[in-house]
Amino acid sequence: MLIHGLQKLTLLDYPGKVACTVFTGGCNFRCPFCHNASLVLRPDEGEHIPEEELFALLKKRQGVLEGVCITGGEPTLAFGLETLMARIKEMGYLVKLDTNGTRPKAVKRIIDAGLADMIAMDIKNSYEKYPETCGISGYDTAPIKESIQIIMSSGIDPMTFAP
């Protein structure tokens, strides 16, 4: 899987855990406020980190790191995501997935396979304002609603944050 960034230590991205964060490239939204716009708009530019560099870090930091946060961009668009998550889990790490919720079938597959210990779904705005907020005119929020239901009924820890 193409890894577009790696934060080797975070105390913020996986609540209550010492973790690292893996960044994927590409996204199916065009949010005007995106804080990772370079990963979204130009995923082929910039840093590309070999998977083996991630796994070397995870091996070296066993007993220090507790989990891995996978974020983006939109990780569910990344080819090889589920394989990467499985390898991380095999090493004994917890996995947190950040998603925009646009791919409910992918979210369900990940949950059903036991690949995520926590899922943080970024709900961008009220359903009525989603098109403006996500940068896609006329966006149908049905996949967002479906992902919310899948996550909430899964038994997996959802991450909830409200300002």
Residue ranges of predicted features:
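A secondary-structure boundary/capping signal
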Residues: 23, 71-72
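Short, charged low-complexity linear segments at domain edges
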Residues: 1-17
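Fold-independent oxyanion-binding glycine-rich loops
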Residues: 6, 37, 73, 123
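SEC14/CRAL-TRIO lipid-binding/transfer domains and related phosphoinositide-recognition modules
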Residues: 2-7, 26, 40, 54
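Canonical Radical SAM [4Fe-4S] cluster-binding loop centered on the CxxxCxxC motif
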Residues: 16-49
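Short, small-residue-enriched loops and turns at beta-alpha junctions
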Residues: 42, 74-76
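Conserved AdoMet/S-adenosylmethionine-binding subsite of the radical SAM
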Residues: 55-67, 76-163
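Conserved alpha-helical substructure of the radical SAM core
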Residues: 37-68
